[in-house]
Amino acid sequence: MALPHAILVSLCEQASSGYELARRFDRSIGYFWTATHQQIYRTLRVMENNNWVRATTVLQHGRPDKKVYAISDSGRAELARWIAEPLSPTRPGRGSALTDSSTRDIAVKLRGAGYGDVAALYTQVTALRAERVKSLDTYRGIEKRTFADPSALDGAALHQYLVLRGGIRAEESAIDWLDEVAEALQEKR
């Protein structure tokens, strides 16, 4: 996911200055997508040049003037396009739920689902779930082949096993969440 799309979702909810956006990011979208204040300001400038946002200067007495950004019609069109755009596929066993940007992308797309194509988002959720199942199957295969008796493990082998278990648990959790999301989206389609 590109930072501009997370910013567009946030601006759909409320016009904001760069500072206000950064604070709101820290309290909401920032739980699954992080950006520094500098990244947000840089991105806002690019988005303004692309006509995705409009800036209005607000005079402040005793303080520097501030720019308040609002999403434009072309910004809404870009957000809708991105929400409908399929996720980039991951290879099974690579880019697990612990590290894959697709899960973060889905979270931001869900946050902005009211501004896009929910049916397309549902398709992406079910496709991502299928990828997560493939990764889980890969991890379980490794577990079965390599760690047949976990109670006998120690040292480096135990540590490797524990990392693998973390990947398995993360995939299971991601699949459970994606099932919940798919069910909710299916009911509202």
From Swiss-Prot:
- Any one Pfam family here would be PadR
Name used for this protein in its record: Probable transcriptional regulator Rv1176c
Q: What is the lineage of its organism?
A: Bacteria, Bacillati, Actinomycetota, Actinomycetes, Mycobacteriales
Main function:
Probable transcriptional regulator that may help mitigate the effect of oxidative stress and help mycobacteria survive inside macrophages. Binds to its own promoter region.
InterPro entries in the record? Tscrpt_reg_PadR_C (IPR018309), Tscrpt_reg_PadR_N (IPR005149), WH-like_DNA-bd_sf (IPR036388), WH_DNA-bd_sf (IPR036390)
GO MF entry, a single one: DNA binding
Q: What is its main location?
A: cytoplasm
Sorted alphabetically, which keywords does the UniProt record give? Cytoplasm, DNA-binding, Transcription, Transcription regulation
Q: What is known of its domains?
A: Contains an N-terminal domain (NTD), which harbors a winged helix-turn-helix (wHTH) motif that is used for DNA binding, and a C-terminal dimerization domain (CTD).
Q: How does it assemble?
A: Homodimer.
Which domain of life does the protein's organism represent?
Bacteria
Where does this protein reside within or beyond the cell? Cytoplasm
What SUPFAM superfamilies does the database record attribute to this sequence?
Winged helix' DNA-binding domain
Q: What upregulates or represses it?
A: Likely autoregulates its own transcription.
Q: Which GO terms describe its cellular component?
A: cytoplasm; peptidoglycan-based cell wall
UniProt lists the family membership as follows: Belongs to the PadR family.
Check the record and name the Gene3D superfamilies matching this protein.
6.10.140.190, Winged helix-like DNA-binding domain superfamily/Winged helix DNA-binding domain
